[in-house]
């Protein structure tokens, strides 16, 4: 149903997506195991991700989207052809990822739809130690008398990011069933391997053919994320001196002990993930490998500003060099790898991308919550390979855990926001 609603000074169409419909779709998708594998070098990292890609491909074709395809890497591409008389409307992409995180099992997910959440503590049936409560998850208050979905206690739920997948699919169905709603070309993209940092590794941007995009991979209803960390990796390689341990006095220099000394020299009460928040950056050791002769320490380095990122590298290198200098004969190599950059640097050059998203969220009846991500998204990478791409909410909560949950009305509002956003691009072109 289309209802014309006036909010001066403009008229726009109110959109309604059924929370029950999007919930049914979401619950089907989460039962497909699509966990990605951080140890794999294949694309996709796990073949089972393609199981959901194939389902989405079939369902898109079933909606009448005839160009829907799935490629060898598990990416799903589709186009809802524009129906406006305007010729200058940019093609807009809506993207979500099919994989779930390696942090928690995604096998045999059993979703439970709590249709009218009453505020009571929820004990998950398959592991009664898993308890969901308003005191631990205050956002539950926003869903009193509405539906929420949990897993059964043994697995994650998969709302990250099958809620985004469900919202995009429900919006696609809306467009196909309501041809009077005007829009330009809408590009749909479902990616594998976002959770292991490879979501854009094999995407064909020419095939996608979108000028601007939006990932559906966010939290509370109304949230809009247009800023991420800038990210790098650092590897410190320490070379010692190895001799027979029986004759090693005053000769052997153990690289493993030096690596331990470097880690011990790092600040204890600052500069780490466990001691920082908001807009603070950090340095985080993630792996130590080696033998007495040679050892490596791998770090991730994060800051919202590229200049801040470099300052972290300079400080880390100085600390390590001072430690290594205390071991006669030892040497050190410090290498940097760029991972991704703050998407805000690109989005600020295209302010309409975020402005239109804010307007769409408001048209969906929500308050915009502008947020920064203390991490990265596929949108970070898309923004730097030609498709400026902020991140829009879906409602996911307690992600990557057995207590993951989502509100059905949030997913419905995400789908409505997609429709409004597509209409705004048509109106403003």
PLM region descriptions:
Residues 1-13:
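Short, Lys/Arg-enriched N-terminal segments with co-localized hydrophobic residues
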Residues 16-148:
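Acidic/His- and Gly-rich active-site-bordering loop/insert found
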Residues 47, 155-166, 249-257, 405-412:
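Short, conserved micro-motifs enriched in small and acidic residues
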Residues 93-97, 189-191, 214-217, 237-239, ...:
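Short beta-strand segments
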Residues 140-229, 271-286, 290, 297-304, ...:
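Acidic/histidine-rich catalytic neighborhood of metal-dependent amide-processing enzymes
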Residues 140-155, 239-243, 364, 396-400:
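Glycine/charged-rich beta-loop-alpha catalytic/anionic-binding loops adjacent to active sites
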Residues 215-241, 245-248, 252-258:
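Phosphate/diphosphate-binding glycine-rich loops and adjacent basic-rich segments that engage nucleotide
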Residues 256-429:
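Metal-dependent amide/peptide-bond hydrolase catalytic core
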